[in-house]
Amino acid sequence: MRLGAQFLPEKFDEYIASVRMAEQAGYEFAWLVDSQVLWEDVYVYLTHGLDSTERITFGTAVTNPLTRHATVTASFFATLAGLHPGRVALGIGRGDSSVRTMGLPPARTGQLEQYVRSLRPLLSAQTAKLDGADVRLRWLQQDPGVPIMMSGTGPRNLRLAGALADRVMLYVGVTPEAVQWAMRHVGEGARSAGRDPAELKVSILCAMHVSDDHEGAAAACRWAPAACANHIADLARNNPRHDMPEVMVRLLKAREAYDYYTGHLDSSAAHTAYLTTELIDDFAIAGPI
Protein backbone atom coordinates (compact mmCIF):
# COMPACT_ATOMS: atom_id res chain seq x y z
CA MET A 1 0.00 0.00 0.00
CA ARG A 2 1.24 3.47 -0.90
CA LEU A 3 0.13 6.51 1.09
CA GLY A 4 -0.57 10.04 -0.05
CA ALA A 5 -1.58 13.11 1.91
CA GLN A 6 -3.89 15.90 0.81
CA PHE A 7 -2.95 19.51 1.49
CA LEU A 8 -4.75 22.83 1.29
CA PRO A 9 -2.82 25.67 -0.40
CA GLU A 10 -2.76 28.01 2.59
CA LYS A 11 -0.48 29.01 5.49
CA PHE A 12 2.60 28.69 3.33
CA ASP A 13 5.25 28.08 6.00
CA GLU A 14 3.12 25.41 7.69
CA TYR A 15 2.47 23.80 4.31
CA ILE A 16 6.18 23.55 3.48
CA ALA A 17 6.91 22.07 6.89
CA SER A 18 4.06 19.58 6.45
CA VAL A 19 5.10 18.31 3.01
CA ARG A 20 8.66 17.85 4.26
CA MET A 21 7.31 15.91 7.23
CA ALA A 22 5.16 13.77 4.92
CA GLU A 23 8.19 12.95 2.80
CA GLN A 24 10.26 12.03 5.85
CA ALA A 25 7.41 9.80 7.10
CA GLY A 26 7.42 7.84 3.85
CA TYR A 27 4.39 9.27 2.10
CA GLU A 28 4.69 8.94 -1.67
CA PHE A 29 2.20 11.56 -2.82
CA ALA A 30 1.29 15.11 -1.87
CA TRP A 31 -2.08 16.01 -3.38
CA LEU A 32 -3.20 19.65 -3.38
CA VAL A 33 -6.73 21.02 -3.63
CA ASP A 34 -7.42 23.38 -6.56
CA SER A 35 -10.09 25.85 -5.46
CA GLN A 36 -9.12 29.38 -6.38
CA VAL A 37 -11.84 31.18 -4.40
CA LEU A 38 -11.34 29.37 -1.10
CA TRP A 39 -7.56 28.98 -1.01
CA GLU A 40 -4.37 30.35 -2.51
CA ASP A 41 -3.11 29.38 -5.95
CA VAL A 42 -2.35 25.69 -6.24
CA TYR A 43 0.23 26.16 -9.01
CA VAL A 44 2.41 28.29 -6.74
CA TYR A 45 2.14 25.81 -3.89
CA LEU A 46 2.92 22.82 -6.11
CA THR A 47 6.04 24.55 -7.41
CA HIS A 48 7.38 25.48 -3.99
CA GLY A 49 6.48 22.09 -2.56
CA LEU A 50 8.58 20.36 -5.19
CA ASP A 51 11.44 22.80 -4.70
CA SER A 52 11.37 22.12 -0.95
CA THR A 53 11.45 18.30 -1.11
CA GLU A 54 13.48 15.60 -2.86
CA ARG A 55 11.38 12.52 -3.54
CA ILE A 56 7.64 12.86 -2.95
CA THR A 57 5.34 13.22 -5.98
CA PHE A 58 3.10 16.29 -6.16
CA GLY A 59 -0.20 16.67 -7.98
CA THR A 60 -3.65 18.21 -7.95
CA ALA A 61 -6.56 16.47 -6.25
CA VAL A 62 -8.16 17.71 -8.24
CA THR A 63 -8.25 20.36 -10.95
CA ASN A 64 -11.14 20.61 -13.42
CA PRO A 65 -12.03 21.41 -17.06
CA LEU A 66 -13.92 24.62 -16.30
CA THR A 67 -11.53 26.97 -14.49
CA ARG A 68 -8.32 25.75 -16.16
CA HIS A 69 -8.10 25.71 -19.96
CA ALA A 70 -6.47 22.57 -21.31
CA THR A 71 -3.52 24.49 -22.79
CA VAL A 72 -2.88 26.26 -19.47
CA THR A 73 -3.01 23.00 -17.53
CA ALA A 74 -0.81 21.16 -20.02
CA SER A 75 1.79 23.92 -20.19
CA PHE A 76 2.09 24.17 -16.41
CA PHE A 77 2.36 20.45 -15.73
CA ALA A 78 4.73 19.82 -18.63
CA THR A 79 6.96 22.65 -17.39
CA LEU A 80 6.89 21.37 -13.82
CA ALA A 81 7.63 17.80 -14.90
CA GLY A 82 10.61 19.04 -16.91
CA LEU A 83 12.01 20.67 -13.79
CA HIS A 84 11.18 17.71 -11.51
CA PRO A 85 11.16 14.54 -13.66
CA GLY A 86 9.06 11.69 -12.32
CA ARG A 87 7.61 13.72 -9.46
CA VAL A 88 4.55 15.34 -11.02
CA ALA A 89 1.01 13.96 -11.49
CA LEU A 90 -2.11 15.63 -12.85
CA GLY A 91 -5.33 14.92 -10.95
CA ILE A 92 -8.56 15.89 -12.72
CA GLY A 93 -12.20 15.79 -11.69
CA ARG A 94 -15.46 17.45 -12.59
CA GLY A 95 -15.01 20.39 -10.23
CA ASP A 96 -16.69 21.01 -6.90
CA SER A 97 -15.88 24.04 -4.74
CA SER A 98 -13.83 25.62 -7.54
CA VAL A 99 -16.98 26.06 -9.63
CA ARG A 100 -19.83 25.95 -7.11
CA THR A 101 -18.44 29.01 -5.31
CA MET A 102 -18.93 30.90 -8.59
CA GLY A 103 -22.48 29.66 -9.01
CA LEU A 104 -21.56 27.20 -11.75
CA PRO A 105 -22.35 23.48 -11.98
CA PRO A 106 -19.58 20.87 -12.17
CA ALA A 107 -18.42 19.67 -15.56
CA ARG A 108 -20.50 17.06 -17.34
CA THR A 109 -18.97 13.69 -18.13
CA GLY A 110 -18.67 14.63 -21.81
CA GLN A 111 -16.76 17.79 -20.93
CA LEU A 112 -14.45 15.84 -18.67
CA GLU A 113 -13.78 13.30 -21.40
CA GLN A 114 -12.99 15.95 -24.00
CA TYR A 115 -10.66 17.70 -21.57
CA VAL A 116 -8.63 14.58 -20.87
CA ARG A 117 -8.55 13.60 -24.54
CA SER A 118 -7.18 17.07 -25.31
CA LEU A 119 -4.60 16.95 -22.54
CA ARG A 120 -3.10 13.63 -23.62
CA PRO A 121 -1.59 14.87 -26.90
CA LEU A 122 -0.70 18.28 -25.46
CA LEU A 123 1.28 16.61 -22.69
CA SER A 124 2.94 14.28 -25.20
CA ALA A 125 4.37 16.99 -27.49
CA GLN A 126 1.66 16.22 -30.05
CA THR A 127 -1.19 18.16 -31.63
CA ALA A 128 -4.64 18.35 -30.06
CA LYS A 129 -7.92 19.43 -31.60
CA LEU A 130 -9.42 22.25 -29.51
CA ASP A 131 -12.65 23.89 -30.68
CA GLY A 132 -11.78 22.95 -34.24
CA ALA A 133 -8.22 24.29 -34.09
CA ASP A 134 -5.02 22.27 -34.18
CA VAL A 135 -3.04 23.19 -31.08
CA ARG A 136 0.28 22.05 -29.68
CA LEU A 137 2.74 23.32 -27.11
CA ARG A 138 5.35 24.77 -29.47
CA TRP A 139 8.10 24.71 -26.88
CA LEU A 140 7.57 21.08 -25.77
CA GLN A 141 9.87 18.72 -27.67
CA GLN A 142 9.31 15.41 -25.87
CA ASP A 143 6.82 13.71 -23.58
CA PRO A 144 7.66 14.72 -19.97
CA GLY A 145 5.77 11.73 -18.55
CA VAL A 146 2.92 13.29 -16.59
CA PRO A 147 0.45 10.60 -15.43
CA ILE A 148 -3.21 11.60 -15.35
CA MET A 149 -5.36 10.68 -12.37
CA MET A 150 -9.14 11.00 -12.64
CA SER A 151 -11.47 11.10 -9.65
CA GLY A 152 -14.98 9.70 -9.63
CA THR A 153 -18.00 9.05 -7.43
CA GLY A 154 -20.70 8.10 -9.92
CA PRO A 155 -20.76 5.27 -12.48
CA ARG A 156 -20.26 7.45 -15.57
CA ASN A 157 -17.14 9.18 -14.31
CA LEU A 158 -15.79 5.96 -12.81
CA ARG A 159 -16.19 4.21 -16.15
CA LEU A 160 -14.58 7.17 -17.92
CA ALA A 161 -11.65 7.06 -15.54
CA GLY A 162 -11.25 3.35 -16.16
CA ALA A 163 -11.12 4.02 -19.89
CA LEU A 164 -8.76 7.00 -19.90
CA ALA A 165 -6.78 7.49 -16.68
CA ASP A 166 -3.40 6.24 -15.54
CA ARG A 167 -4.68 6.32 -11.97
CA VAL A 168 -8.25 6.35 -10.65
CA MET A 169 -9.17 8.10 -7.41
CA LEU A 170 -12.30 6.63 -5.84
CA TYR A 171 -14.40 9.06 -3.82
CA VAL A 172 -17.02 6.68 -2.46
CA GLY A 173 -15.88 5.97 1.08
CA VAL A 174 -13.87 3.10 2.50
CA THR A 175 -16.31 0.22 2.97
CA PRO A 176 -15.74 -2.95 0.93
CA GLU A 177 -19.27 -2.60 -0.46
CA ALA A 178 -18.65 0.87 -1.88
CA VAL A 179 -15.13 0.17 -3.13
CA GLN A 180 -16.22 -3.03 -4.90
CA TRP A 181 -19.15 -1.18 -6.49
CA ALA A 182 -16.84 1.57 -7.73
CA MET A 183 -14.24 -0.88 -9.03
CA ARG A 184 -16.92 -2.72 -10.99
CA HIS A 185 -17.64 0.47 -12.92
CA VAL A 186 -13.94 1.26 -13.31
CA GLY A 187 -13.40 -2.22 -14.69
CA GLU A 188 -16.26 -1.85 -17.16
CA GLY A 189 -14.72 1.36 -18.45
CA ALA A 190 -11.28 -0.18 -18.76
CA ARG A 191 -12.53 -3.20 -20.67
CA SER A 192 -14.59 -1.02 -23.01
CA ALA A 193 -11.36 0.72 -24.00
CA GLY A 194 -9.46 -2.55 -24.44
CA ARG A 195 -7.53 -2.09 -21.21
CA ASP A 196 -6.77 -4.59 -18.46
CA PRO A 197 -8.38 -3.33 -15.22
CA ALA A 198 -5.69 -5.10 -13.21
CA GLU A 199 -3.07 -2.77 -14.64
CA LEU A 200 -4.81 0.39 -13.42
CA LYS A 201 -3.47 2.21 -10.39
CA VAL A 202 -6.22 2.99 -7.88
CA SER A 203 -6.36 5.42 -4.96
CA ILE A 204 -9.08 5.95 -2.37
CA LEU A 205 -9.73 9.48 -1.14
CA CYS A 206 -10.70 9.45 2.52
CA ALA A 207 -9.98 11.10 5.83
CA MET A 208 -7.65 9.39 8.29
CA HIS A 209 -7.04 10.15 11.96
CA VAL A 210 -5.20 7.66 14.15
CA SER A 211 -6.00 7.83 17.86
CA ASP A 212 -6.97 5.61 20.77
CA ASP A 213 -10.04 7.83 21.08
CA HIS A 214 -12.35 6.53 18.36
CA GLU A 215 -15.05 9.16 18.87
CA GLY A 216 -12.55 12.00 18.81
CA ALA A 217 -10.81 10.60 15.74
CA ALA A 218 -14.11 10.26 13.91
CA ALA A 219 -15.04 13.84 14.78
CA ALA A 220 -11.78 15.02 13.19
CA CYS A 221 -12.82 13.25 9.97
CA ARG A 222 -16.26 14.83 9.58
CA TRP A 223 -15.16 16.80 6.54
CA ALA A 224 -14.82 13.71 4.36
CA PRO A 225 -18.41 12.39 4.35
CA ALA A 226 -19.82 15.93 4.44
CA ALA A 227 -18.01 16.83 1.22
CA CYS A 228 -18.58 13.47 -0.46
CA ALA A 229 -22.31 13.79 0.22
CA ASN A 230 -22.42 16.67 -2.29
CA HIS A 231 -21.20 14.38 -5.05
CA ILE A 232 -23.56 11.61 -3.99
CA ALA A 233 -26.47 14.07 -4.09
CA ASP A 234 -25.53 15.05 -7.64
CA LEU A 235 -25.41 11.38 -8.61
CA ALA A 236 -28.89 10.75 -7.22
CA ARG A 237 -30.30 13.89 -8.84
CA ASN A 238 -28.79 13.23 -12.27
CA ASN A 239 -29.49 9.50 -12.26
CA PRO A 240 -32.62 8.64 -10.25
CA ARG A 241 -32.26 4.98 -11.25
CA HIS A 242 -28.83 4.75 -9.67
CA ASP A 243 -27.51 1.53 -8.18
CA MET A 244 -25.28 3.09 -5.53
CA PRO A 245 -24.54 0.96 -2.46
CA GLU A 246 -26.50 1.32 0.76
CA VAL A 247 -23.67 3.08 2.61
CA MET A 248 -23.88 5.94 0.11
CA VAL A 249 -27.67 5.99 0.27
CA ARG A 250 -27.54 6.27 4.07
CA LEU A 251 -25.31 9.32 3.84
CA LEU A 252 -27.55 10.87 1.21
CA LYS A 253 -30.64 10.46 3.40
CA ALA A 254 -28.89 12.11 6.35
CA ARG A 255 -27.32 14.95 4.34
CA GLU A 256 -28.08 18.54 5.26
CA ALA A 257 -27.27 21.91 3.65
CA TYR A 258 -23.60 22.60 2.87
CA ASP A 259 -21.85 25.99 2.89
CA TYR A 260 -18.65 26.04 0.84
CA TYR A 261 -17.61 29.49 2.02
CA THR A 262 -17.83 28.87 5.76
CA GLY A 263 -16.30 25.44 6.03
CA HIS A 264 -15.44 23.38 2.95
CA LEU A 265 -13.28 20.40 4.01
CA ASP A 266 -13.53 21.62 7.61
CA SER A 267 -14.59 19.13 10.28
CA SER A 268 -15.57 21.94 12.65
CA ALA A 269 -18.07 23.47 10.21
CA ALA A 270 -21.69 23.63 11.33
CA HIS A 271 -22.82 21.68 8.28
CA THR A 272 -21.01 18.56 9.55
CA ALA A 273 -22.98 18.39 12.83
CA TYR A 274 -25.48 15.82 11.53
CA LEU A 275 -22.81 13.19 10.99
CA THR A 276 -22.78 10.27 13.40
CA THR A 277 -19.70 8.21 14.14
CA GLU A 278 -21.25 5.34 12.18
CA LEU A 279 -21.65 7.50 9.07
CA ILE A 280 -18.15 8.89 9.40
CA ASP A 281 -16.65 5.41 9.70
CA ASP A 282 -18.04 4.58 6.25
CA PHE A 283 -15.93 7.37 4.73
CA ALA A 284 -12.86 7.57 6.96
CA ILE A 285 -10.21 5.55 8.73
CA ALA A 286 -10.53 6.76 12.30
CA GLY A 287 -9.42 5.39 15.65
CA PRO A 288 -6.73 2.97 16.81
CA ILE A 289 -4.76 0.95 14.29
Locate each region found by the language model.
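N-terminal beta1-alpha1-beta2 module of alpha/beta enzyme domains
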Residues: 1-60, 146
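Conserved, mostly hydrophobic/aromatic
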Residues: 26, 49, 80, 119, ...
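Active-site mouth loops of central-metabolism enzymes
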Residues: 1-13, 63-70, 142-153, 208-211, ...
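Active-site-adjacent beta->alpha loops and helix N-cap segments on the catalytic face
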Residues: 38-47, 174-190
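An alpha-helical appendage that flanks or caps ligand/catalytic pockets
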Residues: 105-139, 179, 184-289
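Short, acidic/polar
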Residues: 11-22, 73-76, 152-160, 289
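Hydrophobic faces of well-ordered beta-strands that scaffold small-molecule active sites
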Residues: 3-7, 30-32, 57-61, 88-92, ...
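Acidic (Asp/Glu)-rich catalytic clusters
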Residues: 19-24, 46-57, 77-88, 162-163, ...
